[in-house]
């Protein structure tokens, strides 16, 4: 049994949403003369270029686009909002329309727009701590605040993280009940990204919430990717969100918006959160491009997410079979049946070797199978994430197997080059 305040961070190596640097590195000079950071940056640029030019990809996201392309994506904004309305000023207008839309989807009394999820969650849990008188927040050691936010909970908001477990799975109701110190809030990341985008079962989620109630704690969902969780739970968004006292959702991950987040919950909490949003510097003068992109994502991407999740399972099964057929000594698709439209792939090679093989495959065949970074914190073991979106729906299982075969050829070439 484990429940303690800190650390235990790297149970699974860090792979932040913004891990890789985007600073441009000149192409001159042999790669051997570059620093490690310069090599990573050059590889990032090659992968981005390959993603843009590839004829076939499993997912295309705004992160890989151009400014011109992203601006063009707002051409359809008139379908979701009256563009003859005045621009927003400090959170009114289109921002309020977005807040009402989110509250309606999640079945909450109100919602508040935030420029970032980091700010939204700190504000939410700070508000709950003020009401309960307890700044302790029970959460997973792999939760986003513990791994990707530079100790913001404690350094900025006076909150105290209490880790329920560091195992690469969701915490259990018994771990919540057995935590030897009191806590004011239970924070559940749904899905838990760094463990493989894992979700509990619907029954397990209800048990977790009930265990928190037994401890007189409120329940907050880190729902950055909650939008794509309905297939796994077999429940609509409002029923899922209805289990929690407050919910954070993101607009730029699965919805592919320009940025931004929302905090949803009781009207009194949201009103207080807006006060803290201002104090935290989140009362931005005008946000209509971001708000419009979020409304477009809710209109266009949200209805398609269940289809992405179901097809991700087809892709994952084909990947697993093809890697096994290729005779790799050890490989893993995790989880075997994805809970969302994203999952992990682990391969028994150094990350640099796998990354180079993945980029070469895209450059030489026009098919990008692995479009994200490879983490190599564990020597000789590489891990990446696979995301299936609209472009991935065009892939059959046979297409996946063919792409794996092309990739494995180059993987063995790169491994042979490195190891002589």
Q: Model-found features: residue ranges?
A:
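Active-site nucleophile and cofactor-binding loops and adjacent substrate-binding regions
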Residues: 111-118, 250-251, 286
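Active-site C-terminal subdomain of aminotransferase-like
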Residues: 37-38, 194, 199, 242-349, ...
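Conserved N-terminal alpha-helix of the aminotransferase class I/II PLP-enzyme fold
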Residues: 38-116, 130, 141-147, 152-154, ...
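Conserved C-terminal alpha-helix-loop-beta "cap" of PLP-dependent enzymes
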Residues: 16, 24-40, 326-420
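Active-site phosphate-binding strand-loop segment of PLP-dependent enzymes
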Residues: 169-224, 228
